[in-house]
Amino acid sequence: GLGKTIEIISFLLYIKEPYPNLQTSTLIICPTSVLFNWKRELQKFAPNLDTVIHHGSDRISEPTELRGFLKPHRVILTTFGTIRNDIDLFQPVTFNGVIVDEVQNIKNISSQQTQAVMKLQGAYRMGLSGTPIENKLMELWTIFKFLNPGLLGTQKQFKTKYVIPIERFQDRDSIQNLKRVINPFILRREKTDENIIQDLPEKNEIKLFIELSDEQKKLYQESVNQVMDLMNNQKIDERQKRGSVLGLLMKLKQICNHPIQFSDQKVPELKNPQEIKKFTNKSQKLKRLVELIDEVLTKKEKALIFTQFRKTGKMIKRVLEHYYGINVLYFHGGVPEHKRKYIVDEFQSKTLDSAPILVLSLKAGGTGLNLTRGTTVFHYDRWWNPAVEAQATDRAYRIGQTEPVNVYKFVTVETIEEKIDNLLEEKKELADQIIPGGGESWISDLSQQKLKELFAL
């Protein structure tokens, strides 16, 4: 929310003046969820830049079509998936520049998506990200292999020189050395910068500690017993045990949300107030959310609700619509592109009858969107990556926001949610020393004893 998109648009306008005779186009690759947002921002701030979208069934597909397509100073917007499919078409082209939005999407060096982007040629390359390190330091090496190949050495050299000393031993000298190498290539803004903080209103972060219902406790304990039996089983090797850890983690998160999330049952229709109340009372988390939404609606404000589970989002949407008789929007990975634009426009609308609540899946809606009409943000279930959570919050808390923003994070007490929340506070300090990061896969790397302590109810 600190102007990365506008920075790039300004840059594209700037280079058009001293270099009017550039013969080809600039390529911008972004997630599908923000494709229309890029188009809209370019039309708004740079209407004289020729902008086209290369995406969908009607896009060009033959090399013979490239000549008329690659116009001077044209901005071509496309997605990661489209580039992966069309790399043979674009690999021979040398673009003015290749710009990758949410560059952490190419963090996995072995993925087809990353391999395709690496093959693109441009006079310059840029990457945009709020979370360049999401899980492991090696992701930074992959991103720099795209931006400045060779700067950080080979994978093996980088691992020996930086990854092992920093991730295993938190070696301060290695952290400082790495910062010295990469900082000249990073333009970084933070909300604490003096010239930015004056443009932002206050942000209040509140943790809401919730208890499990009796039904949830029973399900939780049964699941924990399963994993304890597995971890104590001498016949199963360590790799299999660790593989099951993240699977159980997802189960426990779902139980903390609502008992129905753990079952194969569909969310009921909730046809009358009695059914709604009975269903809501099965989860103190859902009950508390409903109460807080009442405050939002009373003040005639708007709210964002983030969850990582599609079934949870569907449940929240249905409960709130039936409880309050309002239109609740739901933005997730399965929403078609044309409808995504409608959802954002509807939420951002200032008309009295516009939708006041927007539920978003963390993966599809946690980056790139401008949702400054929201003044309350709920993290219904926690993502064990503080940087990703912060990115989601920044859909509302960004330049353009004029009202104070309240951020509520639900934490179910005496469960894995509370214990990992405490661990994250300790972990965040190291991640912040390099670039904001810290992720979820570290949980499976904990010792067996530490895991047992985490899972115990």
Model-derived features with residue positions:
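A short beta-strand element within the Helicase C-terminal
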Residues: 93-96, 142, 369-382, 405-410
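Walker A/P-loop NTP-binding motif
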Residues: 5-21, 116-121, 146
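A conserved SF2-helicase RecA2
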Residues: 384-393, 397-457
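Inter-lobe coupling linker of SF2 helicases/translocases
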Residues: 77-82, 88-91, 151-261, 407, ...
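Conserved P-loop NTPase motor "coupling/switch" region that bridges the ATPase
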Residues: 71-72, 97, 105, 114-196, ...
